[in-house]
């Protein structure tokens, strides 16, 4: 059973099962993103299929029109799906790995005067959220929202997700200097207008950021900082399965829906506390 893997299980009425050791009842949806949902599984499968087949992202308004549900329900369904996409954002990268950080948020100059953030320039952007990404050439990508783009927040994530025998490529941002102690580290100097030097470049990870930001601008319009990691998960999953056929991507996702349940209360409380 999902409550005790050593327990016997009894089949009960109404497609339910009972765990002998804990006495708890469960069904095939328990512990998955479908647990206690009032939306039909047919609509869930349609929503997941649409997410898997839309290369540039799927908005809650479009899903609302397709399923005939409220925008709130469509948004919550998509957030559950995006959280589940995080199962493919845990890879350990080897061989040649590019890494780069980016900032997500609107341009300060475009804000109304009473909403502009003072002293917000360059890397001191107080109004933007830093996101750190690593991509293995001809392999997978890992990306996560970070508190800051400093060494104390970036280096531990590199050590966690990049094999110590890998060769890493970065730009000249000072937070990466600590990588020299562990990795074979090469730097491309963008401030000198150097973008490619043989195999030394960060073009793949920058391409990933470009696709991600175009989706935010063109599909989602506005993404709250508190939920940004869910959107990052979605695009990491898209990139890591870019060579999959849509049906294969759908099945790969469905094989990993266990353990990623998200309650609406948790989603809202997380936003309030962040």
At which residue positions do the language-model features occur?
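Residue-level recognition of single "structural anchor" positions
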Residues: 1-274
């Amino acid at each position: 059973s999902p409550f005790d893997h050593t327990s016997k299980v009894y089949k009960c009425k109404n497609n339910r099962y009972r765990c002998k050791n804990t006495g708890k009842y469960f069904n095939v949806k328990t512990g998955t993103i479908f647990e206690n949902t009032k939306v039909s599984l047919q609509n869930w499968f349609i929503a997941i299929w649409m997410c898997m087949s839309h290369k540039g992202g799927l908005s809650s308004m479009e899903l609302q029109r397709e399923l005939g549900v409220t925008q709130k329900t469509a948004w919550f369904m998509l957030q559950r799906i995006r959280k589940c996409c995080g199962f493919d954002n845990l890879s350990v990268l080897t061989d040649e790995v590019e890494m780069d950080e980016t900032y997500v948020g609107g341009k300060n100059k475009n804000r109304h005067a009473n909403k502009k953030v003072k002293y917000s320039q360059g890397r001191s952007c107080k109004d933007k959220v830093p996101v750190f990404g690593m991509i293995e050439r001809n392999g997978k990508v890992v990306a996560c929202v970070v508190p800051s783009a400093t060494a104390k927040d970036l280096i531990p994530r590199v050590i966690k997700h990049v094999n110590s025998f890998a060769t890493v490529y970065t730009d000249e941002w000072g937070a990466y200097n600590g990588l020299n102690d562990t990795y074979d580290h090469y730097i491309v100097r963008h401030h000198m207008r150097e973008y490619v030097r043989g195999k030394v470049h960060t073009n793949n990870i920058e391409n990933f950021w470009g696709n991600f930001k175009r989706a935010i601008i063109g599909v989602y319009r506005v993404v709250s900082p508190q939920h940004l990691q869910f959107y990052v998960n979605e695009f990491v999953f898209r990139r890591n399965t870019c060579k999959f056929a849509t049906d294969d991507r759908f099945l790969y996702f469905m094989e990993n829906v266990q353990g990623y349940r998200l309650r609406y209360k948790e989603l809202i409380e997380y936003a309030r506390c962040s």
